Each structure stands twice: as structure tokens, then as C-alpha cells.
């Protein structure tokens, strides 16, 4: 765990808190996503336009691959510990975006069942079932099963072999300095994740190539460890340092700094019962004033509001002009929070219904994909 005073706490397995993202970027060498960089991309996702994805390491490598008509890899995964929620959706959308950005991109998707066991004590048999459900969500979000290789960490010998090799390149003190005092199983799972990220560059997978890993800011310790290992073992494998993009850590529905299963009212699952989902949305933290009169006179505070920031901006309103209208209406005091929640619920519930319909059609395909790794 990286901890710099109480304003910056980064723990990929625990609670992270980032008050100042500029400080995070200075401390650890993350570059900002600039307007000039966005202009180099063939298309720009709303998460980039709205600065939800705020930083990167070596995104230029991916842009160069596109310009030179070269292949690159998009790598991500999921710890199969429960159903897809909004946080899972965020990373999944980034994965699909970078995959669809260029025809020669190919995806690798790790089912992190070893991490689920090390961190959550979830048996491999149980995580297998959860993984199928997670993959059904991923397919419903638009993943092309012909352009991805899906695997379970526990069964992917190339990844496990790399993790063992990498263990010669780090010491216990190094891992403790990066992650803090953790059970050794979590340290090993970090080496396995490094194997996940670098395995696409092995000779049997086509050799060294640019790789991009979209992550939340709290996962940067894994990226830094992996990039360090890529350098240490460059003479053995010819690894190209993996690129990464970073998205903001979003609050839960109640306004807490990070979603936690210990606060179930703060998490919105994609398969949520609609009655419960509605209750969560209507109880979400807002930027409303103390009274309706104050709201009309002073205007609302959408920059503080979970409904506007975390739900509409990040997830459910694609059109930038529509989003701007909603923002201005709130700031002008022309709408009260109850009305805004009702309108937001119409948008969210429609999305959830459509997603559920798509997901039901992908369950068999998800099981097949996990069994066969890719589809032709």
C-alpha cells in the first residue's frame, strides 16, 4: 500500500483515497491525457472526453501502432468475486473501446480466480460460475468474442510460468515497499498479474508488441511493478513496456469515496432487481441545497452530486449536449433533486432493462467462450 499522508492512499486490494490527482501524477510519473493526444485517436470515448480517464503511461505507443498499421494488445481482466457493478462496467467499456479502436487490436481477458482465492477465499469452482456470469455482462456490453482470448489464471500455464520467473526479479522487501504488509498470497497474485500483462508478448503469442491496460488509479502499483519487471527481463524476452490508462476512483451511490460490499446501498449491480435499483438511485447522495427555496435561488451543485457525476456523466448519458443541458438546469435552480432523480431513473432503468435482455441472450455464449478461450 502506497500511503503519502492521508491525502493519498493507494491499495489495489483495499481502500484507496486520492484527494489530489495532480499530486498522484507527480509522485508516480503518470502523464495527463492532453487535447493533442486525443486528436491523434481515430475516435474519442465519452470517458476520455469527460476526463474520467485522466492519465496514461505510454499511450503514444498505441497511437503509433495505429498510425503504422501494426497490431497491439488490449489486456484486462476481472476478479470473479460477484456480479458486474458500475465499477466493472467502467473498465469493461474501456477494454471494448480500445479493442474496437483499430481492426488489428486483439484482446486478452484474465479471469483472476487465483486473486479471488488469495483476496476473498473464493474456491476456484465457485469463481468459475461467477466468471460465466461476468462474461455474459461483458458480451452484452459489446465484446466481440472473436477478438479476445479469455482464460482462467489457474489454468494458464504461460502466465504461471512467467510469474515464477518474475519471482527471481523481486524481493520480499520490494513487494512490501510497493504494497505494504500483505499476505504472501497477494504478493504472488501481483506477480501473476504481471504475467497476465506480459504473456501476450511471449513468442508463442506472436512476440513483443505494444500492450495497453486500462485500469483505475488504485491499480497503478501493479502497472509500475509490471513495467519494472518488463525492463528487468527485457534481455530474456524483449518485452515492450506495457502502456496504461487511468480512470478516476468514483464514489459509491451514498457519496462514500469507494464502492464497498460492506455498504450494499452504495453499489448498483447491472443485474439489479429494478425495485431495489430504484430505491438505491432515489437514496443517492445529491448536490441539493438545504431547502427547495435555496435550491431555486442559489441553484444546485451538480459537481457534488452522485446522480450527475457518477451516474449520468460517467455511465448513462452519451450525448455531451444533453449532459450540458442537465448541468445548466441544475446550476440555475430550475430543477429540484427529487425531479432530477426521477428523470435520471427513467434513463437508468431503460438502460438496465436493455442490458438485461442482451445478457440473457449471451449466457450460453459466455460459457462457451470461457471453455474455448476464443471463438472463430
Predicted regions and their residues:
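Non-catalytic terminal extensions that flank enzyme cores
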Residues: 1-78, 227-282, 288-291, 306-376
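N-terminal Rossmann-like or analogous alpha/beta NTP/dinucleotide-binding catalytic cores
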Residues: 1-73, 80-199, 357, 375
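Structured ligand/cofactor/substrate-binding pocket environments in proteins
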Residues: 84-90, 96, 113, 122-127, ...
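Hydrophobic/aromatic-lined pockets within catalytic cores
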Residues: 100-103, 139, 143, 168, ...
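Short helix-capping/linker segments at secondary-structure and domain boundaries
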Residues: 104, 199-211, 315-325
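Residues on a specific face of well-ordered alpha-helices
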Residues: 132, 136, 224-228, 279
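Short amphipathic alpha-helical segments and their helix-coil junctions
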Residues: 146-147, 166, 170-179, 281-297, ...
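Short, solvent-exposed polar/charged micro-motifs at secondary-structure junctions
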Residues: 158-164, 225, 254-257
Amino acid at each position: 500500500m502506497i500511503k503519502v499522508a492521508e491525502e493519498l492512499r493507494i491499495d489495489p486490494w483495499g481502500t484507496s483515497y486520492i484527494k489530489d490527482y495532480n499530486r498522484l501524477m507527480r509522485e508516480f510519473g503518470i502523464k495527463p491525457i492532453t487535447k493533442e493526444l486525443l486528436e491523434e485517436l481515430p475516435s474519442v470515448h465519452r470517458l476520455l472526453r469527460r476526463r474520467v480517464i485522466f492519465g496514461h503511461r505510454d499511450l503514444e505507443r498505441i497511437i503509433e501502432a495505429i498510425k503504422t498499421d501494426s497490431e497491439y494488445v488490449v489486456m484486462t481482466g476481472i476478479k470473479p468475486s460477484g456480479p458486474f457493478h458500475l465499477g466493472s462496467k467502467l473498465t469493461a467499456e474501456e477494454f471494448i473501446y480500445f479493442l474496437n479502436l483499430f481492426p488489428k487490436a486483439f484482446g486478452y481477458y484474465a479471469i483472476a480466480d487465483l486473486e479471488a482465492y488469495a483476496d476473498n477465499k473464493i474456491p476456484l469452482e465457485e469463481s468459475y460460475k461467477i466468471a460465466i456470469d461476468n462474461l455474459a455482462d461483458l458480451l452484452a456490453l459489446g465484446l466481440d468474442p472473436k477478438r479476445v482470448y479469455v482464460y482462467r489464471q489457474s489454468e494458464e500455464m504461460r502466465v504461471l510460468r512467467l510469474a515464477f520467473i518474475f519471482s527471481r526479479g523481486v524481493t520480499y522487501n520490494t513487494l512490501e515497499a510497493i504494497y505494504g504488509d500483505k499476505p504472501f498470497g497477494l504478493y504472488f497474485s501481483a506477480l501473476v498479474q504481471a504475467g497476465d500483462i506480459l504473456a501476450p508478448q511471449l513468442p508463442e503469442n506472436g512476440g513483443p508488441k505494444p500492450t495497453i491496460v486500462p485500469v483505475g488509479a488504485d491499480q497503478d502499483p501493479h502497472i509500475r511493478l509490471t513495467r519494472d519487471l518488463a525492463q528487468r527481463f527485457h534481455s530474456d524476452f524483449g518485452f515492450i513496456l506495457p502502456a496504461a490508462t487511468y480512470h478516476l476512483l468514483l464514489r459509491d451511490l451514498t457519496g462514500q469515496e469507494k464502492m464497498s460490499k460492506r455498504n450494499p446501498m452504495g453499489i448498483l449491480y447491472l443485474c439489479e432487481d429494478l425495485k431495489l435499483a430504484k430505491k438505491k438511485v432515489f437514496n443517492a447522495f445529491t448536490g441539493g441545497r438545504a431547502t427547495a427555496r435555496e435550491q431555486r435561488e442559489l441553484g444546485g451543485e451538480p459537481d457534488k452530486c452522485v446522480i450527475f457525476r457518477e451516474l449520468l456523466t460517467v455511465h448513462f448519458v452519451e450525448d455531451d449536449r444533453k449532459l450540458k443541458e442537465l448541468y445548466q438546469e441544475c446550476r440555475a435552480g430550475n430543477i429540484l433533486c427529487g425531479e432530477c432523480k426521477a428523470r435520471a431513473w427513467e434513463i437508468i432503468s431503460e438502460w438496465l432493462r436493455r442490458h438485461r435482455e442482451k445478457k440473457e441472450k449471451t449466457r450460453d455464449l459466455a460459457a462457451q467462450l470461457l471453455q474455448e478461450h476464443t471463438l472463430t
